[in-house]
Design a protein with these regions (language model features):
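C-terminal, surface-exposed recognition/capping segments
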Residues: 1-29, 33-167
Length: 167
């Protein structure tokens, strides 16, 4: 999904991004700076723009950047090339406080039509706007040699790992 969009698509680009124009130089929603678009001071996705909420129902939503940071810091992370015999590569997080385990597949990301990092990297959107530039949003990012969270272009097709919605 592109950030703030609720349907997958074949091509991911600024030209077909729902909330931007002019190659990402002007945002039409989720903008806090006059110089970068139409200001609405929204820092988190509305429910109707949350891919998890729209596709999986009211009990689910995309995590905030703070929740992704807590997940990152609250687990010991290991890379696997073959999670539980499935042949799927990704990161396994082992909770530092209980026996919970989470697996995040290295699903890559799509820019244009190509997913060149499938099996090598993972990128999981948060619901939070990137503070440094309005054309980016926060996401959890990893490969076998790093795991971190960062912000980057909203138009790219990245994964969504839903969390339970507390309503």
């Amino acid at each position: 999904f592109a950030w703030g969009e609720t349907e997958p698509k074949k091509i991911y680009s600024w030209e077909n991004y729902k909330w931007g124009r002019d190659e990402g130089q002007f945002m039409t929603k989720y903008c806090t700076k006059d110089s970068e678009g139409k200001v609405d001071n929204k820092h988190e996705l509305d429910k109707e723009d949350d891919a998890a909420f729209v596709n999986w129902g009211k009990d689910w939503r995309m995590p905030t950047a703070k929740e992704e940071e807590e997940l990152l810091e609250g687990c010991v992370w290991e890379w696997t090339n073959n999670y539980d015999g499935t042949g799927v590569a990704g990161r396994v997080g082992f909770s530092k406080t209980n026996s919970n385990i989470i697996f995040l597949p290295a699903a890559g990301y799509i820019s244009g039509e190509e997913n060149s990092s499938l099996g090598n990297e993972g990128f999981y959107w948060s619901s939070s706007l990137f503070k440094n530039t309005m054309n980016g949003s926060y996401f959890l990012s990893f490969a076998n040699y790093y795991i971190d969270w960062r912000g980057n272009k909203r138009y790219a097709g990245r994964s969504v790992r839903a969390v339970v919605n507390d309503h």
